[in-house]
Amino acid sequence: MSLRTTQTIHGSYLMPSPGHASVADAMHPGIITCDAEATLTEVARTMATHHVHSVAVLSLARGSGPSEEAEIWGIVSDLDLISAGIRGGPERPAADLAHQPPLIVEPTLPLREAGELMVAHGAPHALVVEPATNRPVGMLSTLDIVGILAWGEA
C-alpha cells in the first residue's frame, strides 16, 4: 500500500493512495439520522447543526413482538432540501424527499468500486454497512472520495 503523510490543522495522518483505498479509509464514521416524519425545516436544521450534507431517514420496522427497531430506508441530501425548498413546502416530510432505497456499500469495498457504484446510481452518498452485523457504521460521500483523490498518492 502506498501512503502519503498529509499535514492538517490537527496534525498529520497517513492517506492511502486512491488505487489502494477502501471505503473505510474515506467514510465518515457514524451517521446522522432523522425520522421519516421530520419536516424539511427540521432536516435542514439537523444538517446545519451537525455540518453534514446528508441524513439517513429512519422508519420503524415493526416485528411480531413488542420491540421496535429503527431501520434506515432512505437518504436525504442537501440538494434534495434545496430542490424541495425552491418548490415550496417547508413542512414536507423527509419520507417524501428521501432517495429510496439507499445505496449500501461495505467498509472493505475498494474505494474505486464504491465510486463507480455511486456514479452508476447517481447517488452522492452511500450508507456504509458492516456485513457481519448488518448495522450502519458510516456514510460515504462523493466529497470523501475527492479527498482521497486530492491527497492520496496517484
Region spans (language model):
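Tandem CBS (Cystathionine beta-synthase) repeat/Bateman regulatory domains
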Residues: 1-154
